[in-house]
Amino acid sequence: DFIKSEIGHRTNVIAVGNSGNFVTMACSNSPELFNRIILVNPDSILTCAQTPGRYTKFYKEFLDLPIIGTLLYHIAVSKKSLRKFAKEYAFYNPHLIKKSYIDTCYENAHLGLSPKSIYASVHCNYTNCNIITSLKKIDNSIYLIGGSDLYLEEELLKEYLSYNSAIEYTLIHETKYYPHMEKPNEFLSTVFLFLS
């Protein structure tokens, strides 16, 4: 709807992480609205296909409790937890992690009417969707960009190729989950190369 009402023509889209699932599904439903799609470190196809199980449903109910759930949420999105996530998983070079980045993540985790509900839905697989059929159906150009130092990232990107051989991918060396923040110039040149 946003592309139809605001942009008004075919557009290129860049999506990071699990937001790529929504872009893939939207492109499958309305391919005429999309030109090229760039997915940065998309979730594995197996992760996309996971649905809420018994444990995750219990965890979601637990997080929805007013006092205990809110306490767990605040622990999960504390500055200490965000810093640990950034150092261990998100960034190749921990010296690139700016205090402003952690502050922004922390602030965004507390904005809105119910950020705890979004957190619970994402972590308990309620926002996942199986994209295999969509990947097979899409005829638009799809490019994948990954951080070379994420565990098994190249294998994950090759998994996408097994469902649509027209997909292309590249890895940006010495980056992890946020190559656009760790090596912005290299990321931009890669994007311009894909879009030209």
Residue ranges and their predicted role:
Residues D1-T11:
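Conserved acidic catalytic loop of the alpha/beta-hydrolase fold
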Residues N12-I14, R36-I38:
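Residue in the alpha/beta-hydrolase core beta-strand immediately N-terminal to the catalytic nucleophile
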Residues G17-N18, N41:
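Catalytic nucleophile serine of serine hydrolases
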Residues G20-P31, I37:
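Short glycine-enriched nucleophile-adjacent loop
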Residues S28, I37-G69:
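Flexible "cap/lid" loop of the alpha/beta hydrolase fold
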Residues C48-T51, H74-S134:
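Conserved alpha/beta-hydrolase catalytic His-Asp/Glu region
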Residues D139-T175, M181:
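Conserved loop-alpha-helix segment in the C-terminal half of the alpha/beta-hydrolase fold
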Residues M181-L193:
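Post-His helix in hydrolase/transferase enzymes
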